[in-house]
Amino acid sequence: MSLGTAARMPSPKAPDYEKGKWAAAFAPREAGERRHWLVKSEPDVFSFDDLLAAPKQTTHWDGVRNHAARNFLKDGMRQGDRVFFYHSMANPQAIVGICEVVREGYPDPSADDPQWYAVDLRAVVRLARPVTLAEIKARPELADMALVRVGRLSVTPVTPAEWETIVAMGDRGPG
């Protein structure tokens, strides 16, 4: 097999989300339909506590420089969607809170190139108990979650079933 062929073949660990699971993130919506997402941040750069301390508990989510994640910001996230806030590069790595999209995708003001997008997020609630990556990986019903399958992305969709499972694991939070 040539290197070119190998590069085009889907990884057995990372299913073809563009044609499968991720396609739902871009599908037409019913009126009032709310979708769910996950964003990652290193807590020493910007934490959920920082979001809670921000004016109106709101911030612009900028600095994303990955095309797949940019597409979720630009074309997937809509006002009213709910978002898990995940602390990456932390000990432990965990989902710690829930946010809401309050402004849909717009050109990222921190970027020199207008191809990059940002959204505005507002804190909704801190989870009563953080849900760690280890706990997520231990749950068979979360095995296909984008966080587990393609953990490098800083913005990913979350299915309704994944959302409900994690909210229950965190003991608190609106749907």
Describe the residue ranges of each PLM region.
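Short, acidic Gly/Pro/Ser/Thr-rich loop/turn segments
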Residues: D44-F46, A128, T165
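Aromatic- and Lys/Arg-enriched surface recognition patch
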Residues: A94-V155
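Charged phosphate-binding loop/patch that engages nucleotide di/tri-phosphates or the phosphate backbone
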Residues: V158-G175
